[in-house]
Amino acid sequence: MDGGKALRVLVADDEPAIRTLVGRVLQRAGFQPVEACDGQDAIERLDASDFDAVIIDLMMPRVDGYGVVEHLIGTKPEMIEKTIVMTAFPRAATKDQLHHLCTIISKPFEVNELVALVRDCAAR
């Protein structure tokens, strides 16, 4: 990791089981996951702290993944290329700006694929 320090990854999903699974997978891979329960929570955490990568679900209450990406564009544009959008509806995500800005992973996904994507995004 980064000089022995675990890279911090924000994981935003409104499904507790998904957050827990992704968090455990990332922790086992040597990352330090930080959970957010929805898009608004993700925005608050992004404003309060720095992260090496971000994983967000596309469909969440209060603020969805699109809203989080728009917030990042306005406040931390350097984080866009470090953002992974998870979605059960990949066609919806690829039809707009997310296709060109963020890495998209379809649910369900292979955990090894997710870990590889996080490593790649954190290195950008």
Enumerate the language-model features and the residues they cover:
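Non-catalytic signal-transmission and effector/linker regions of two-component phosphorelay proteins
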Residues: M1-R8, N112-R124
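Charged docking surfaces used in two-component/phosphorelay signaling
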Residues: T20-R28
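Acidic, metal-coordinating helix/loop segments flanking the phosphotransfer/catalytic sites
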Residues: E35-A53
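Acidic catalytic/metal-coordinating carboxylates
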Residues: D38-D41, D64-E70
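Active-site residues of response regulator receiver
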Residues: D57
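Receiver (REC) domain active-site loop signature in two-component systems and cognate sites
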Residues: M60
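Hydrophobic/aromatic residues positioned on beta-strands within the core alpha/beta folds
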Residues: M86-T87
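A Lys-centered signature of the CheY-like receiver
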Residues: K107
